[in-house]
């Protein structure tokens, strides 16, 4: 800013790290000359009194001429705080210079837009002018009325001034005023006396409270120093409670672990059961396809088998059909996991039990597969009408294959 204003020297904040009154006085004189070149301010700052007088003169000049209030203490310190005070003056000069430059650059634009104006601002100015005109009219009317009454008022005023004062009435009024003043003084004295008495009472109460506080403090210290009789029992109960809590935590963790193991076991059993069902379904589909293929191949051959043998084979197939579904259902019911769980809290034999159960399930699944294959072959064999007689060789071949 100082460079923009035309100050010849370069100024930085490093110059004000330590008090530098010479630089501050030089800058102040230059700024004052910028405001008013004909001003006469003494520049002597050798002694302390001269510096104080210089700072006061600068502050008074800026307050009267530029309406800028400066802090004389901060200026006298001549450090970083003085820079803030100097900025108050330089900012005003810098803003004035900027506005002047902007006005010079906008002269051509003002000539071009001379007849252009802001309609909104003009309307606001018009409203303000109308309000002021109405106020001026009202004030003028009231002033005219008062001036019309001035003749009568002048006569009354002169009569009141010329009338002699009665001493008795004046003394009476003065005595009444003196009595009122004396009553107020007495009231004030009473209040002061009451304040003194109240102060004494408050001091007495404060002393009493202090004594009670000291007494209670000593009592508290004695109570803290004495060990209660029930403290030993309390500590024992607390230790026992802590032990019970530890046992509870251990059992709770074991229970949570066992519940998780049970859920895992149920999930594994469900997965095995679903896998067995899927394998059975696949085998059934495969058997159906094989039976269809065998039926198609057997239908092309001639029937040379005796009717009696056909009847015997039909009866045997009926017996096998009735016996096999019952055994398959028993195997499936044995293969399903029981919902009742019997055991101890120890988990040492869980792996062996799971292995044995897995082996039993595998054996039962194999038996179920064989029974289902036989059932499918038996159920599909008598599907054709009795008019055609089939040879036994395809059935034997299908049983031997599976």
Curated annotation (Swiss-Prot):
Keyword check for Hydrolase: no
GO terms classed as biological process: axoneme assembly; cilium assembly; floor plate formation; heart looping; left/right pattern formation; neural tube closure; smoothened signaling pathway
Residues in coiled coil: 187-297
Positions with biased composition (Acidic residues): 301-317, 349-377
Keywords carried by this UniProt record: Cell projection, Cilium, Cilium biogenesis/degradation, Coiled coil, Nucleus, Phosphoprotein
Leader peptide range in chain numbering: none
Modified residues (Phosphoserine): 303, 313, 315, 398
GO cellular component terms listed in the entry, alphabetical order: centrosome; ciliary base; ciliary tip; cilium; intraciliary transport particle A; intraciliary transport particle B; microtubule organizing center; nucleus
Pfam families tied to this protein: Cluap1
Localization per record: Cell projection, Cilium; Nucleus
Annotated region (Disordered), positions in chain: 292-402
PANTHER family linked to this entry: CLUSTERIN ASSOCIATED PROTEIN 1 (PTHR21547), CLUSTERIN-ASSOCIATED PROTEIN 1 (PTHR21547:SF0)
Functional note: Required for cilia biogenesis. Appears to function within the multiple intraflagellar transport complex B (IFT-B). Key regulator of hedgehog signaling.
Subunit description: Interacts with CLU/clusterin. Interacts with UBXN10; the interaction is direct.
Record's protein name: Clusterin-associated protein 1
Organism the protein comes from: Rattus norvegicus (Rat)
């Amino acid at each position: 800013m100082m460079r923009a204003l035309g100050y010849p020297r370069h100024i930085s904040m490093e110059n004000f790290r330590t008090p530098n009154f010479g630089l501050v006085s030089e800058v102040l004189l230059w700024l004052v000359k910028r405001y008013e070149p004909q001003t006469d301010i003494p520049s002597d700052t050798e002694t302390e009194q001269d510096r104080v007088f210089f700072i006061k003169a600068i502050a008074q000049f800026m307050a009267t001429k530029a309406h800028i209030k400066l802090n004389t203490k901060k200026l006298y310190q001549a450090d970083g705080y003085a820079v803030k005070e100097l900025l108050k003056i330089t900012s005003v000069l810098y803003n004035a210079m900027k506005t002047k430059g902007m006005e010079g650059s906008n002269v051509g634009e003002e000539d071009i837009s001379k007849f252009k104006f802001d309609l909104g601002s003009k309307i606001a100015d018009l409203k303000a002018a109308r309000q002021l005109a109405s106020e001026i009219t009202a004030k003028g009317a009231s002033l005219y009325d008062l001036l019309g009454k001035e003749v009568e008022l002048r006569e009354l005023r002169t009569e009141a001034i010329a009338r002699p004062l009665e001493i008795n009435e004046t003394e009476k009024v003065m005595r009444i005023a003196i009595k009122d003043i004396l009553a107020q003084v007495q009231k004030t004295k009473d209040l002061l006396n009451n304040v003194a008495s109240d102060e004494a009472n408050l001091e007495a109460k404060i002393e009493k409270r202090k004594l009670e506080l000291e007494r209670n403090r000593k009592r508290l210290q004695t109570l803290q120093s004495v060990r209660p009789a029930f403290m030993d029992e309390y500590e024992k109960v607390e230790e026992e409670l802590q032990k019970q809590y530890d046992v509870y935590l251990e059992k709770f963790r074991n229970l949570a672990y066992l519940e998780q193991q049970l859920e895992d076991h149920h999930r594994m059993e469900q997965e095995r059961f679903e896998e067995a069902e899927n394998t059975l379904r696949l085998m059934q589909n495969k058997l159906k396809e094989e039976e269809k293929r065998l039926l198609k191949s057997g239908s092309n051959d001639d029937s040379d088998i005796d009717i009696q043998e056909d009847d015997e084979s039909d009866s045997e197939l009926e017996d096998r059909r009735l016996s096999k579904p019952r055994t398959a259902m028993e195997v499936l019911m044995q293969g399903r996991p029981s919902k009742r769980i019997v055991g101890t809290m120890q988990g040492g034999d869980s792996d062996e039990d799971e292995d044995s159960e897995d082996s039993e399930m595998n054996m039962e699944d194999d038996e179920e597969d064989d029974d289902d294959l036989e059932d499918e072959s038996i159920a599909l064999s008598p599907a054709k009408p009795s008019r055609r007689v089939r040879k036994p060789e395809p059935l034997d071949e299908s049983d031997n294959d599976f």
